[in-house]
Structures are given as structure tokens and as C-alpha cells.
């Protein structure tokens, strides 16, 4: 009998372009990114914060190593907090594109390992 693939559909992902947009343009919405040396990005979400994010949230090569270690075959990459609902027109569109483009790129590079979940 063939082994069924193990698929993780709860695989949050923060593409570099998404984080840069958040850092550069999120301030007027109370959003931002602070880069802590040797720890990774910390997201400012209004009064709260999230992070520092583990490197595998942003680095797909590290994520693949982690997936192999825990024997997960496929990650359905998805966005999580702060989402994009808070962002106005142009910024919201740019954030969506950054996320969707990064998920598509990940799938093209590793079609058997990553799918996008928008």
C-alpha cells in the first residue's frame, strides 16, 4: 500500500516582501516590523506584538529541513496575523500580491512540498 502524504494545512508564512511592506508602510495603521538582531522579526500589531518569529516562518530552506525532520510532506502556506484587512486600498493590494506571489514562487520551486492557501 502507498503511504498517504502528511499535509499540514496550518503552516503560517511571512514572505520577506510582505514584511518589508509592513515595515515601510504599516506605521500609519499602527503596524510595523522591528528586526531584533539574532532573533528575527517582531511584528507590531496595534498595541500588541508577535515574535520574534522563528526563522522557518520566513526561510523556506529552513522550513524544508524542519518538515523533513518531523516527517511532514506538504505545507499549505498561509498568512496569519496581522492579515491585510486593516490596510487601505493600495497597501492592502500590495500586501496581498506579496503574499500570493511568494506562495506561487514557493510552489513553483517545490511543487511537491508547498501549496498556497489564501
Regions found by a protein language model. Name each.
Residues 1-118:
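Helix-coil boundary/capping segments in enzymes
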Amino acid at each position: 500500500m502507498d503511504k498517504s502524504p502528511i499535509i499540514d494545512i496550518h503552516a503560517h508564512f511571512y514572505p520577506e516582501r510582505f514584511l518589508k511592506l509592513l515595515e515601510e508602510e504599516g506605521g500609519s495603521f499602527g503596524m510595523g516590523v522591528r528586526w531584533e538582531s539574532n532573533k528575527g522579526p517582531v511584528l507590531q500589531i496595534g498595541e500588541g506584538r508577535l515574535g520574534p518569529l522563528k526563522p522557518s516562518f520566513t526561510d523556506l530552506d529552513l522550513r524544508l529541513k524542519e518538515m523533513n525532520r518531523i516527517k511532514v510532506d506538504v505545507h499549505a502556506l498561509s498568512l496569519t496575523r496581522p492579515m491585510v484587512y486593516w490596510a487601505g486600498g493600495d497597501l492592502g493590494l500590495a500586501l496581498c500580491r506579496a503574499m500570493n506571489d511568494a506562495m506561487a514562487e514557493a510552489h513553483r520551486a517545490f511543487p511537491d512540498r508547498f501549496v498556497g492557501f489564501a
